[in-house]
A protein has these predicted regions:
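Active-site metal-binding motif and surrounding structural segment of the metallo-beta-lactamase
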Residues: 1-33, 37, 48, 122-127
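Structural motif
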Residues: 4-5, 100-102, 125, 159
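Conserved phosphate-coordination/catalytic loops
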Residues: 10, 15, 83-86, 108, ...
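Short active-site oxyanion
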Residues: 24-30, 100-102, 190
Length: 202
């Protein structure tokens, strides 16, 4: 795997799977959200682990764990079994003196605390997991098209990269449908919807 380091926002199977365990070198620097995830990765043989804080670093890159996200609706988290399954999933802000500030929202729905994170950090580039995955009867567990528009209205100068579509079977929003929505709302200059494996450079 050609990466200097890895950030694991959480350890659901669609983010951290058997392929990751097998392909990533056990001494690769890996940043995780909490002690629980660190313990899991340690049990899988990884030993160069950092639990992210509000101010972690990797070389000249400042890594800030955000706390505003929630991997589902309040209704879903009111059910203890479902809350345990959804768990915690963080966002991350990356800053470097010579690069644009990047905010990776992670698996979260749109909520006031996410808006507060965006206003606080003022990122130049925002990566949104925008497949609009749902738990039946409990609503979305990640963002959808309206949420992407909310981000654009809040930070109109930011570039938005929409990912995590067509990734798992409970994602309701396809790349094609999101592209049509973006065009209908005339925000195409602000939004990238990359294909799997595509690199986006700003």
């Amino acid at each position: 795997l050609d990466a200097d380091a890895v950030i694991v926002t959480h350890t659901h199977d669609d983010h951290w799977d058997r392929a990751a365990v097998e392909l990533i070198a056990k001494d690769k620097p890996i940043y995780v959200q909490n002690d629980r995830d660190a313990a899991l990765l340690r049990s899988q043989g990884f030993h160069n682990l950092t639990v992210m804080t509000d101010e972690s670093t990797f070389g000249d890159i400042r890594i800030t764990k955000t706390h505003g996200g929630q991997h589902g609706t309040d209704r879903a988290y009111a059910v203890p079994e479902l809350a345990e399954r959804l768990g915690e999933a963080c966002g991350v802000v990356l800053r470097h003196p010579d690069e644009k500030t990047l905010y990776i929202a992670g698996d979260t729905v749109w909520r006031d605390a996410v808006a507060a994170d965006l206003q606080k950090h003022q990122p130049d580039v925002v990566v949104l997991n925008a497949g609009y995955a749902h738990v039946i009867g409990f609503g979305p567990i990640i963002m959808g098209e309206q949420d992407l528009l909310n981000v654009h209205f809040l930070l109109p100068q930011a570039k938005i990269v929409a990912v995590h579509m067509e990734a798992i079977n409970h994602c309701l929003l396809s790349r094609r449908a999101l592209r049509e929505y973006v065009e209908a709302n005339q925000i195409g200059d602000a939004v990238s919807i990359p294909q799997d494996g595509e690199t986006v450079i700003f």
